[in-house]
A protein has these predicted regions:
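Conserved phosphate-binding catalytic cores of ATP/NTP-utilizing and phosphoryl-transfer enzymes
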Residues: 1, 108-130, 308
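N-terminal beta-alpha supersecondary unit
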Residues: 2-82, 111, 115
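Short beta-strand scaffold segments in enzyme catalytic cores
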Residues: 13-19, 131, 139-143
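A contiguous, well-structured pocket-lining segment that forms one wall/lid of small-molecule binding clefts
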Residues: 69, 184-263, 272-286, 313-316, ...
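Short Gly/Thr/Asp-enriched flexible loops that form oxyanion-binding sites at enzyme active sites
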Residues: 78-102, 273-282
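Conserved phosphate-binding/catalytic loops in two-lobed NTP-binding clefts
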Residues: 108-109, 263, 280-304
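Glycine-rich phosphate-binding/hydrolytic loop that grips phosphoryl groups
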Residues: 115, 293-331
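Glycine-rich phosphate-binding loop plus the immediately following alpha-helix
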Residues: 146-188, 213-214, 218-222
Length: 336
């Protein structure tokens, strides 16, 4: 079964053809990242305009790369939530039009579910398992009970891990995206040079990163006021350690308490080298099995949408003609 996956939740316009939820036949991405760099972050208006300009060509290229046309597609899967509402609407409306024009079933896909599904593409992972989903907008610990059933065990109370890393990178004067820049420079610094706070929370699996973000801002401002040279690499390494240690500690507690031995990472921050290394160390120590998405599938892409779309489709999920886009949507809410 071939699924055409369409993704437009942020600044990547992406489409892919995926067979049986596991085999990627094509994967095409057009990004407006370079434009957003000029502003130090994603500008929703620019993202939406670039989606509108690119989506038709991206879908055509994905079909061509897979050596098929719409007659060879069994269903169209499209990201409908969460994300930038204007960006999402471009993908949803394009997919709805294509579905009606070709009489092809349409399947709505939750963005975070598709990030989880990136692991299905690159390995033999099957539910049940515990997944740490970390991105610029979300930080969740999710029990994946089957391919379409999820239970959120913990989530961030404030900033997401990716957001905190990006803002710290910007504070340190590093190029956008800040999280990627921190990951690149951190190996040249001393990760024990600065101690960043680990917040106490009354819920055992939740996260809070606003305190870490405030701490690095205060350190930078204090040193600048004194005219001191910023030890950028040390600050980057220490901040990255603070964020990733918090993520791994909460993941370990949730896995231990709930008895999970199959662990996965997902989302853009799952590409972070220290997070991957420390999670691997934890799983080796505990004798758990770790599943990591390939780096090319960590960021937003159409292949992960096609993968999750397959499992939603075979479970009977179909979009109604009035399918809309939503800026927010819990991952554990049933899909229609």
């Amino acid at each position: 079964m071939r699924i055409l996956g369409i993704e437009s939740s942020c600044d990547e316009t992406a489409a892919a053809v995926v067979q049986d939820g596991r085999q990627v036949l094509s994967n095409v991405i057009a990004t407006s990242l370079e434009e957003h760099k000029l502003y130090g972050g994603v500008v929703p208006e620019i993202a939406s305009r670039r989606h509108a300009e690119s989506i038709s060509g991206v879908v055509r290229q994905a079909l061509a790369d897979a050596n098929c046309d719409m007659s060879g597609i069994d269903a169209i899967a499209v990201t409908y939530a969460p994300g930038l509402i204007g960006a999402l609407l471009v993908g949803v409306n394009f997919a709805k039009g294509l579905s009606m024009a070709t009489n092809t079933p349409l399947v709505p896909v939750h963005h975070l579910r598709s990030h989880v599904a990136a692991n299905y593409i690159t390995g033999d992972l099957q539910p049940p398992f515990l997944c740490l989903v970390v991105s610029g907008g979300h930080s969740h610990i999710v029990a994946v009970e089957d391919y379409t059933t999820y239970k959120v065990l913990g989530k961030t109370r404030d900033d997401a891990a990716g957001e905190a890393l990006d803002k710290a990178g910007r504070t340190l004067g590093l190029p956008y995206p800040g999280g990627i820049s921190i990951d690149k420079i951190a190996p040249t610094g001393d990760e024990n040079a600065f101690a960043f706070p680990h917040p106490w929370l009354d819920t055992p699996y939740d996260f809070s990163f606003s305190g870490l973000k405030t701490a690095v801002i205060n350190i930078v401002h204090r040193m600048e006021q004194k005219g001191e040279t910023l030890p950028v690499a040390d600050l980057a390494a220490s901040f990255q350690k603070g964020v990733t240690d918090c993520l791994v500690e909460k993941l370990e507690k949730a896995a231990t308490d709930y008895g999970y031995t199959s662990i996965a990472l997902a989302g853009g921050v799952s590409a972070n080298s220290r997070l991957r290394r420390e999670t691997d160390r934890l799983c080796r120590q505990k004798g758990w099995q770790l599943h990591l998405p390939a780096l090319k599938y960590c960021g937003d892409n159409g292949a992960m949408v096609g993968a999750q779309g397959y499992y939603e489709y075979v479970s009977g999920v179909r979009a109604q003609p009035d399918l809309n886009a939503y800026a927010t949507m819990p991952i554990d809410r049933p899909t229609f």
